[in-house]
Regions:
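Short glycine-enriched loop/turn motifs at secondary-structure junctions
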Residues: 1-2, 48
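Negatively charged, low-complexity tracts enriched in Asp/Glu with abundant Ser/Thr
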Residues: 2-19
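Extended, low-complexity, intrinsically disordered tandem-repeat tracts enriched
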Residues: 10, 58, 91-92
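Periodically patterned hydrophobic/aromatic "hotspot" residues that form packing/interaction faces
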Residues: 17, 42, 62, 89-90
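Acidic, low-complexity, intrinsically disordered interaction modules
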Residues: 24-83
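Short acidic DE-rich linear segments
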Residues: 84-94
Length: 94
């Protein structure tokens, strides 16, 4: 398994990111595409075709997230767990 810890702008952004990318009850990944990146903000498209933005701490966190989530978007890997701790999100994929 592979994991990444991302630091968001605040606790709210961390909870939003965790809920947008993965739903624990159904084990589904909702993110289908990264639509745009503007500085430390990532705009994501989810399964229902809606767009949502999440603000991460800095550009390094954006690079970490976009690199980590790419294999999930390409359906090469699946997210199996997300956990928020303060303004951080731990994402685990297999």
């Amino acid at each position: 398994m592979n994991s990444a810890t991302l630091i968001c702008q605040d606790k709210y952004a961390a909870q939003k990111l965790a809920n947008l990318i993965f739903v624990n009850d159904t084990k589904e990944t909702y993110v289908t595409e990264i639509l745009n990146v503007v500085e430390n903000e990532v705009v994501l498209s989810i399964k229902d075709k809606s767009a949502h933005s999440v603000v991460l701490e800095d550009n390094d966190q954006v690079l970490l997230f976009t690199d980590f989530i790419q294999s999930v978007i390409e359906k090469k890997q699946k997210i199996v767990q997300t956990e928020t701790v303060g303004s951080s999100v731990v994402i685990v994929k297999e």
